């Protein structure tokens, strides 16, 4: 099984177990841990945020991008609007150096946000300002200027930011989302707790992303665990 294949609309439940079984001999290596974390992030973003067409692309020449995907937020927004009424949204929202048209005013059933994901499988280190700057550079290299407002840069890490890191993240002139996804835990018997660990714990948008995704209801969707009801349909 190729771990760099495209996961179209769902993440097979046995993917992580298959990866672990196929790579048991290198389970203590950083390569194993890195790929396991990338697959864990794919699982959580597909199951909780309903991203689609996700592909692990990380490698020597990945340009700082580990995973690519597409995000149709419309089903999430429609589901959450059945429970929450949002205030009227202006046609454009101001940012420090520009203004943007919120995605809510542009979204259509077949319109997707392009997502670029970078994973930091840290055990204890926090995300620094230098790493945020590198992430901004990766976005600038990968995304043409004309697509900057229809693309999202996502950083996933099991740890949070340093003070400098969160400041630069918030001030970045690109739409950025941070998802805190825990790593899969290894049990005392050497097995991996795929079912109960490796979960999405935190979702955070910088100022640019919060304006772009205004009234889409993503944070409300997660708080109310909307993904549980949608998964049952």
Curated annotation (Swiss-Prot):
Query: In terms of one coarse class, where is the protein primarily found?
Result: mitochondrion
One Pfam match, by short name? RRG7
Q: Which Gene3D superfamilies match?
A: 3.40.1350.10
Give the UniProt subcellular location, in the record's own words: Mitochondrion
Family stated for the protein in its record: Belongs to the RRG7 family.
Task: Supply the PANTHER family for this chain.
Answer: REQUIRED FOR RESPIRATORY GROWTH PROTEIN 7, MITOCHONDRIAL
UniProt-recorded name of the protein: Required for respiratory growth protein 7, mitochondrial
Species of origin reads Kluyveromyces lactis (strain ATCC 8585 / CBS 2359 / DSM 70799 / NBRC 1267 / NRRL Y-1140 / WM37)
Gene, per the UniProt record: RRG7
């Amino acid at each position: 099984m190729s771990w760099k294949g495209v996961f179209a609309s769902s993440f097979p439940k046995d993917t992580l177990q298959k990866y672990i079984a196929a790579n048991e001999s290198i389970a203590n290596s950083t390569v194993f841990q890195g790929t396991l974390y990338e697959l864990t992030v794919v699982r959580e973003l597909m199951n909780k945020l309903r991203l689609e067409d996700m592909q692990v692309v990380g490698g020597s020449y990945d340009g700082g991008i580990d995973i690519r995907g597409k995000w149709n937020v419309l089903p999430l927004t429609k589901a959450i609007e059945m429970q929450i009424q949002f205030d009227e949204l202006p046609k454009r929202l101001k940012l420090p150096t520009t203004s943007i048209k919120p995605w809510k005013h542009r979204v259509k059933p077949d319109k997707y946000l392009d997502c670029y994901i970078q994973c930091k499988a840290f055990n204890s280190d926090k995300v620094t300002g230098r790493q945020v700057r590198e992430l901004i550079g990766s976005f600038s290299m990968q995304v043409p200027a004309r697509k900057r407002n229809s693309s999202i840069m996502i950083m996933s890490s099991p740890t949070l930011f340093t003070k400098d890191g969160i400041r630069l993240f918030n001030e970045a002139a690109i739409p950025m989302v941070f998802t805190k996804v825990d790593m899969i835990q290894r049990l005392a018997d050497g097995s991996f707790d795929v079912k109960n660990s490796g979960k999405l714990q935190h979702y955070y948008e910088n100022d640019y992303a919060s304006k772009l995704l205004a009234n889409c209801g993503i944070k409300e969707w997660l708080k109310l665990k909307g993904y549980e009801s949608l998964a049952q349909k």
